[in-house]
Amino acid sequence: MSQKRVYLFGNGKAEGNAKMREELGGKGANLAEMNHIGVPVPPGFTITTDCCNEYYQVGQQKIMELLNDDVMAAVKHIEDLMNCKFGDAKNPLLVSVRSGARASMPGMMDTILNLGLNDEVAEGMAAKTNNPHFVYDSYRRFVQMYGDVVLEMKPVNKTDIDPFEEIIEKVKKESGVVLDKDLSVEDLKKLVKLFKAAIKERTGKDFPNDPIEQLWGAICAVFRSWMNERAILYRKMEGIPDEWGTAVSVMAMVFGNMGDTSATGVCFSRDAANGENLFNGEYLVNAQGEDVVAGIRTPQQITKIGSQRWAERAGISEAERVAKYPSMEEAMPEIYAELNSIQDKLEHHYHDMQDMEFTVQEGKLWFLQTRNGKRTGAAMVKIAIDLLHEGMIDEKTAIQRCEPQKLDELLHPVFDKKALASAKVIAQGLPASPGAACGQIVFHADDAEAWHNDGHKVVLVRIETSPEDLAGMASAEGILTARGGMTSHAAVVARGMGKCCVSGVGALNVSYKDKTVEIDGVVYKEGDYISLNGTTGQVYAGEVPTKAAELSGDFKELMDLCDKYTKLQVRTNADTPRDAQLAREFGAKGIGLTRTEHMFFEDKKIVAMREMILADSVAGREKALAKLLPYQKADFKGILEAMDGLPVNIRLLDPPLHEFVPHDLAGQETMAKEMGVSVEDIKRRVDSLAENNPMLGHRGCRLGITFPEITAMQTKAILGAACELKKEGKNPMPEIMVPLIGTINELKQQKEVIQYAAKEVFAEYGTEVEFEIGTMIEIPRAALTAYLIASEAQYFSFGTNDLTQMTFGYSRDDIASFLPVYLDKKILKVDPFQVLDQKGVGRLIKFAVKEGREVRPDLRCGICGEHGGEPSSVKFCAKIGMNYASCSPFRVPIARLAAAQGALECE
């Protein structure tokens, strides 16, 4: 643990820097760095992430004792630089207390503003500033925020009413005002008193008047917020470890709510939605930062071009825009010029798109935060390629800047343009996060989660979202909000998740109580379908059809860069020519797994398959298999043709035979009729196929050994298809894979059957094709005896699904009953069927690759389980020298990027 617990910054100096994210969190490290490069930042200090972990180890009282001297000295540091005193009524210092983890977690943890106010300080501050409205507006905000965050009065359930919001609405109604900003000084003073009374009633405790007590309450509340429900969920979604902890940054307050020369805002150095190299953002005059991020007031645009685009979408004339909604560039030109200059400086310093928060206090600009901005998958790719072209980063950095999982967003369907032409537009909002979303309306986050779990596609409709809505946002196809701009919580989180979002739709009249939303006089109920276009901000009635996404030139350039540096090829798992062709378009270098059993379930094929299963002699089975052979050959021909010139690895029959027979009476009666036998005969045969543990039973190569005619038929179908294609001038490259090998003798026996069948096929067609025989390593014993098996196998394909099952002893079908408990108790960090277990299963794979290549130096090795498209698993494969990873077609680009990153990490 770091000995130093508190780091100071301010007045162009800082004890930390941008490289200290682990100790100071992203926010603290960047606040220090901005001081070093001359960006105006209010003075303050950062408490390290180690202290957060210590808080959970030793408790609140002990951590306060350990930190007390350092924190009091740090407060004195701020007092000296600001020339005012914490808790002093005549010349008071107020501070903000903010969280800041190593990785950005927007809105997931807590912030407290205006800390240090009490009745005496407020009175003195009002006299000093001659602006009592600003002071008591800040005071009521502080009491509410402190009650919500520190005293934990924020409602947890959707049916609970926020006591503070209820009081505000009551006072506004009594005073005849609509907006919070129109409340009088007396109204604001009344709110402070009523808020304190509500705190006393709800908690049994008085609101703390001592600023030091307030400060410790806030610091410990931020530590606590690291383990709040939404933060835990966000970390799971983003793969952020619980052990990182959060830092706490305490800064002198600067005020955006001191009048018309004050403002607050959020800005981005590039467009976070589409990656366009255009400075953009939003600001509010006479407001505090939380107003912008929370989306409670819809803000104005910072740039003139942004304002004009917004007005055009909203149907507002240029004259009205200039009069009512001027951009900062027009309304505050000097501040805008300074802001624009600093954002450019920050982007060039960090060499990445920046997300910045700022406040203007009576004409002076202050920066409160900068961080690498969250962005959509499309923006991620465009920004990386643009920065490369601009000379700000090199090729390797461009590859490493991109998150493999986010490429998935680029492959999602988009609205069909023809369908859009006839679709009914019911509302226009801001294009907060691009994409196409169709679903049934729900109004609460927990309903979105429940409906999603029941198999429904939903659109979450809210007045505005808050961090508590995270689980519902993750479950929804898209998010629609009545309030909030392009930098609101809904917009920022949706972009980070890759979710479609339309925000700031003023035409929405949402009733949570009735579960309805009214748009231009038309009422839409929970369960009604709507569609969102997150690229244009348009909302449509009903379901609008979608089509496959069109990939950009930037995407192709990124993929070409990946191929330049990668050593691990990416193949695909494909059972149909259509899947094979799609994967080829995504850059797959062949097929790593074709599952032959999926081909048997079409009507005519399943009848012949069942006839083979029912047969009680070799002759009977061969007769049925002869019917199957032309079907199989046609299937294989289509796949080999789609992958012409690339290898196609075909797995022989793997599942147990009982999967091909009906287990219900109606199905058995149909089968009996098809076979021309009695239902009793069918029942007897079905019963005879039953196994207590089919996963370890009569399947894979065991089927081929007990029924070699199955292996022979499949070999003839594969090689027959290849011979036909060769005669047509094509270049088929078949690979025949024997599944579930546990001993070398199993492989030897199956290899003999395959080679004998191959001779027959080549004699029949009068031509030969080159093919390879390999095996699937999915039994631990096969991995441990790889040195033996490699003498017979030309390649190894690791079936990581079954290898994980047999190494852990977990059933993939049953793990869901205990996995949540294992994850919660930290027995497992991740689902081993989603992310390859590198310490156990991975060690077996590494051992088998090494042992196999000692016997056969040119042994080709790949994986073809679900892990073949999971980035960390692909990187592992690259690092241990495997030849390929195979995954589903839509994950091919993800695996290509991960493979390139794995190669670069090995340099």
Where are each of the predicted segments found?
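Structural motif
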Residues: 249, 442, 459-461, 480, ...
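Long, charged amphipathic helices and adjacent flexible linkers at domain junctions
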Residues: 69, 237, 399-451, 457-458, ...
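Nucleotide/phosphate-binding sheet-loop regions of phosphoryl- and nucleotidyl-transfer enzymes
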Residues: 1-423, 450, 456-459, 466-471, ...
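Conserved alpha/beta-domain cores
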Residues: 98-99, 551, 561-907
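Glycine-rich phosphate/ribose-binding loops and adjacent secondary-structure elements
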Residues: 364-366, 459, 466-474, 486-493, ...
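C-terminal accessory/binding modules appended to enzymatic or scaffolding proteins
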Residues: 13-21, 433-475, 841-857
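A short, small-residue-rich loop immediately preceding and capping a beta-strand
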Residues: 477-483, 501, 862
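Short beta->alpha connector loops at strand-helix junctions that form conserved
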Residues: 45, 482-484, 503-506, 594, ...
